[in-house]
């Protein structure tokens, strides 16, 4: 087992990697004609903070796993207290920073760009941004104040060890901790909605898209030429009618205008399709078999994620401490899921578990990006902003960053469902008489130390059972939307290769 200092060195490396990765993603999607430094900085900071919350988990697990030796004995109480307080403080700093970025900085930057005009001075835009941001600041203060007064109550539990653990760890919260957790829980509820809409669809659409690929260029070209010929034929009919001296009705003039717009759009698409087979893009065809292989691997990973989540949900019903009153918190997972087994086995061999967690998070993050790209930034059926390569406006980029941040907050909770045993206690064991057994919630509180992420999620679920219930049934909704998205992805027609290289949106014209 590596010392905890190795974990913090790895975490510092991950921090730098995440900053570089998020900067690349933000610049990749930023509009090439309209990109702001404020938008870039705030988006990178917000995305990095939420991902750090998840990437801190393996370090948290290493921290608690190195508190007990292989014979079940523990390190000194002073070292335990010092190390747990350090990790807990970092979690709360990250959560508090997320609240500040998502509820204050992002709204300010959004309204700052909304007021953009060459004739409006910068100070006026700053004033307008601050004016509208005041409402979000008041909302944040209300959340924190309400959270400070919402205190967890006692639970109907018979097991004395579990009751002692709840009294010592869950009910023993100060006002600051309660307010921050309450505010983060409210944002996480929104995160479940984002996860269900974008991430669940991306988990199926991203790998299926790699497997299916784009339409064959010849077929695509043939379809475009047919549509173009039909549009020109109809347009010629109305044009010849007008040329012969007959007047066109208002409806006919509108139809002719639409047909000419369609002609222009189809001609653009045909030109892009010709360009898609030239230069470097022609070489990319060689890698098509690899895209199919990776797509097949990724869909297996997606199915493994959903299966692990379902097993965890079923297990919570059967082994919950006190049902919905405790937010479906379970003492020890009875049903073993694949990710939990793998990560628990790898926990003593850090950084192998860090690599698995990092790969899993990056995959889910990529699926969320894929979902946002495919669905767009919408409010119900209204498409607010286009989200694509080099054509996302600053306001759209900020909203996309908020969607990704909320999804990452939900992912923070879903990691507990994916690997409950690993996340709660890592590789910790304790001496029970003559045998050494894995740590659980109903183990003596002085012999097992739960990870800080395990304590935080338990405080959210037990502190206000409403959140635990919403998170539990919200996860079932995520599973259902994944199945629906999988069906849609399988039966949906392959996209045109021309659209992949579009610099301008012409969908509306067609």
From Swiss-Prot:
Record topological domains on the Cytoplasmic side: 62-88, 151-178, 311-345, 417-465
Record-linked InterPro entries: LMBD1_LysCbl_Transport (IPR050854), LMBR1-like_membr_prot (IPR006876)
GO cellular component terms, A-Z: lysosomal membrane; vacuolar membrane
Membrane spanning residue stretches: 1-21, 41-61, 89-109, 130-150, 179-199, 290-310, 346-366, 396-416, 466-486
Pfam families reported in the protein's UniProt record: LMBR1
The entry's keywords: Cobalamin, Cobalt, Lysosome, Membrane, Transmembrane, Transmembrane helix, Transport
Intrachain S-S bonds: none
Keyword Transmembrane helix among UniProt keywords: yes
An annotated Gene Ontology molecular function: cobalamin binding
Cellular compartments annotated: Lysosome membrane
Topology class, membrane: Multi-pass membrane protein
GO biological process: protein localization to vacuole
UniProt main location, coarse: membrane
Residue ranges, Extracellular side: 22-40, 110-129, 200-289, 367-395, 487-510
Function: Probable lysosomal cobalamin transporter. Required to export cobalamin from lysosomes allowing its conversion to cofactors.
Family membership: Belongs to the LIMR family. LMBRD1 subfamily.
Protein name listed in UniProt: Probable lysosomal cobalamin transporter
Source organism: Dictyostelium discoideum (Social amoeba)
Gene name as annotated: lmbrd1
């Amino acid at each position: 087992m590596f010392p905890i200092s190795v974990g913090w060195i790895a975490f510092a490396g991950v921090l730098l990697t995440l900053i570089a990765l998020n900067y690349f993603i933000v610049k990749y999607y930023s509009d090439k004609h309209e990109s702001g430094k404020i938008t870039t900085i705030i988006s990178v900071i917000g995305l990095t903070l939420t991902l750090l919350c998840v990437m801190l988990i393996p370090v948290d697990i290493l921290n608690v796993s190195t508190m007990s030796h292989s014979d079940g004995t523990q390190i000194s109480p002073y070292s335990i207290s010092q190390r747990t307080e350090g990790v807990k403080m970092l979690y709360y700093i990250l959560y508090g920073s997320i609240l500040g970025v998502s509820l204050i900085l992002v709204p300010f930057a959004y309204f700052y760009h909304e007021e953009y005009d060459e004739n409006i001075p910068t100070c006026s835009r700053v004033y307008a941004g601050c004016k509208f941001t005041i409402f979000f600041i008041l909302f944040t203060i209300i959340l924190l104040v309400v959270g400070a007064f919402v205190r967890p109550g006692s639970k109907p539990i018979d097991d004395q060890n579990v009751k002692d653990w709840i009294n010592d760890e869950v009910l023993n919260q100060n006002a600051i901790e309660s307010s921050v957790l309450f505010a983060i829980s409210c944002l996480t509820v929104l995160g479940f909605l984002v996860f269900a809409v974008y991430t669940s669809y991306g988990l199926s659409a991203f790998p299926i898209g790699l497997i299916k690929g784009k339409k064959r260029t010849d077929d695509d070209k043939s379809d475009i030429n047919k549509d173009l010929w039909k549009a020109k034929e109809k347009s010629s009919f109305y044009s010849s009618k007008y040329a012969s001296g007959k007047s066109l009705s208002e409806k006919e003039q509108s139809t002719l205008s639409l047909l000419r717009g369609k002609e222009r759009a189809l001609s653009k698409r045909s030109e892009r399709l010709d360009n898609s087979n030239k230069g470097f893009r022609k070489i990319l065809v060689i890698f098509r078999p690899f895209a199919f292989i990776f797509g097949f691997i990724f869909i297996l990973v997606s199915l493994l994620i959903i299966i692990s989540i379902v097993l965890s949900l079923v297990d919570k019903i059967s082994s919950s401490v006190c049902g919905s009153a405790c937010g479906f918190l379970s003492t020890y997972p009875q049903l073993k899921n694949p990710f939990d087994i793998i990560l628990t086995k790898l926990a003593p061999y850090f950084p192998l578990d860090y690599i698995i967690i990092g790969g899993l998070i990056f995959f889910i993050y990529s699926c969320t990006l894929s979902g946002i790209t495919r669905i767009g930034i919408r409010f119900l059926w209204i498409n607010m902003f286009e989200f694509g390569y080099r054509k996302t406006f600053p306001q759209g980029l900020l909203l996309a960053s908020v969607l990704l941040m909320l999804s990452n907050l939900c992912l923070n909770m879903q990691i507990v469902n994916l690997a409950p045993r690993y996340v709660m206690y890592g590789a910790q064991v304790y001496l029970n008489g003559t045998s050494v057994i894995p740590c659980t919630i109903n183990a003596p509180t002085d012999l097992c130390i739960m990870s800080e992420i395990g304590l935080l999620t338990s405080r959210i679920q037990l502190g206000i059972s409403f959140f635990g219930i919403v998170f539990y049934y919200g996860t079932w909704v995520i599973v259902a939307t994944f199945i629906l998205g999988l069906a849609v992805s399988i039966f949906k027609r392959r996209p045109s290769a021309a659209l992949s290289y579009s610099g301008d949106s012409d969908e509306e014209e067609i």
